Amino acid sequence: MKNKKKYILFGAVDIGYRIEHYSKFIENHLSHRLQAESFSKYILPSSHYKTKYTFSCPIDKTHPILLYSFSFCFFIFSLFRYDIFHFISGETILTRRLRSMELKIYKLLGKRVVMHFVGSDIRSEEYLTMKEKNIHQFLKGEDFGEKSMLSQKKLIADAKHYADYIIVSTPDLKKIIPNSIYYPVVLDYQKFLDEVSAISFKPKSNNEVVILHSPSSVKKSNLKGTNHIMSVLNKLVASNKYNIRLILPAENNVERKTNYSASRYELFSYYNEADIVIDQMIIGWYGLLSVEALVAGKYVVSYVEESLKEELFPECPIKMADVNTLEKVLIEIIEEILKGKNPFMCDIQRNWVKKYHTIENMNEELLTAWHLKSNI
């Protein structure tokens, strides 16, 4: 007997531009077994980055009564339509106060629930702030207690109790939810290349070395270690030894429509300009910014916690640094750039990303989460 096609819903917030990418993968490779649809409560302006969802009800643009009414009606509709619910960052269809009840209903009806956590949803800002302020002690082996707030612990408890599968996007989160599965960020490789190549950018002058540091949030740049990074960058610039130009979107005092320091399209332009991209010095793992910058052919610098280095994929091309070694690592990279960088570097980096950070080559965890056989 032929298996009936199942329906999966992605929602209800799209962190890291996952939803359209995952849906595209299903359409291209699994359409005979799975139909993907999406619902989002948060919609970024198209000027930031154009993406699409099957259903949406923007929480910041919808009257609360209309929002609650739409969400409730969509929830009832979803019970009859979907077999699998893949929730990103802990956001479900109904309000957070009703999350436990909502997840319980899915479980009672035999629905498959996947909870997909990306970082700030279960790792508290207070913990990272404490880590940032005491990063030198942390590097010596000291830690700073609770990694999750009370509300996050409730979310974690709900996920453990009701979810069939829990995914985390950075391996440090496995310490918070030990039974979770690490699934790395993946890049829509060809789409990214096409979009970056279509963006204009400011050309470099001779012997100029351009360094980009762009924390995602202007208000929370300390969580990426921006203060420590700026201290090193300012020292390098002040030395006048190198012709350095800095691209620092979070430092620009401009009014923005979102909390992001730069739109994704602006980032594409910055990738084209930069020689070096610095990700973060606090969290302890690299993110989508690093992956994109590698594909763009840039030197990428990031901090990876010592205890997490065993989780790195083989031959990782990211230059590892912490707040103590960042200056030394940057000087080594600058000297290499001025001498003439390896002509094969870009190809090496792109091949590494294709192997370990594309959904075409890294999908086993998702197929397991969706309760599908591993072959596509």
Regions found by a protein language model. Name each.
Residues 1-49:
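N-terminal subdomain of nucleotide-sugar transferases
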Residues 17, 339-371:
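A charged, aromatic-enriched C-terminal amphipathic alpha-helix characteristic of glycosyltransferases
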Residues 73-80, 101-112, 132-165:
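Membrane-proximal helix-turn-helix segments that form the acceptor-binding/catalytic region
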Residues 138-140, 144-202:
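Donor nucleotide-sugar binding/catalytic pocket of nucleotide-sugar-dependent glycosyltransferases
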Residues 185-262:
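Conserved catalytic-core segment of nucleotide-activated headgroup transferases in glycan assembly
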Residues 281-282:
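Aromatic "clamp/platform" in nucleotide-sugar-dependent glycosyltransferases that forms part
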Residues 299-302:
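Short hydrophobic beta-strand element within catalytic cores of glycosyltransferases
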